[in-house]
Amino acid sequence: MELFWEPACEKALLEAVDKEGLDGKIIRVGNLMSRQSDGEFQANSITNGFMRDLKGYATLKKFPVNSMDVEVDFSPIDEVAKTILLLSKTSSKFTVYHSANSHMVQMGDIIYVLNELGFGIEVVSDEEFLKSMKEMMMDDSKSMLVSSLISYSSSDMHTHSFILSDNEFTNKSLYHLGYKWPITDYQYLKNAIESLDTLGFFERTDL
């Protein structure tokens, strides 16, 4: 088995571009979500960390109030593919892009849609969330479903922070290329979560 450390791979590519004249680009992507065209997920797009977090909240049925205003992107996988094709044709002097939907949504929006669909997630204090998560981690039948939330297990939740990214340059490049990201509206969120539910995503322990 070969393991590739992402930063090391990027470093190697950038060195090849700089020293060997390789025509290459690094295009990082956001949270790959259901297609904009029909709301369907590709099989391998439901295994990323963000999706596992959603499963954890749905299983725990609790969400920390201080994270309700955290912003995330929903990047439809078919739209990401379009941007990659466009960005790959840009000047060779530009080598790093971040293809992520520029229209952010707050976690609170997602929690409310989940609840409208019957998931019954309670918004609670950080302390209550942490207590409930630790209790569920002791349940062998459910611990795997909430394992992605293990970073909250620190005794001090205030030590955790979200790393913000800036893809302003990429977004402006896409505008120059005649592309605009679709707005992530209520209907898209609802369709995406319903599609996940139909796939049995929230109950499966193998994803």
Please name every model-derived segment.
Residues 1-30:
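Active-site Tyr-X1-5-Lys
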Residues 26-28, 33, 97-101:
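Short beta-strand segments
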Residues 160, 164-207:
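Amphipathic terminal alpha-helices
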Residues 40-49, 112-118:
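Short secondary-structure boundary/capping segments
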Residues 63-67, 130-180:
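A hydrophobic C-terminal alpha-helical subdomain
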Residues 35-46, 65-75:
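Glycine-rich "substrate-gating" loop/helix at the edge of Rossmann-like oxidoreductase active sites
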Residues 51-65, 71-107, 111-116:
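Alpha-helical substrate-binding/gating segment
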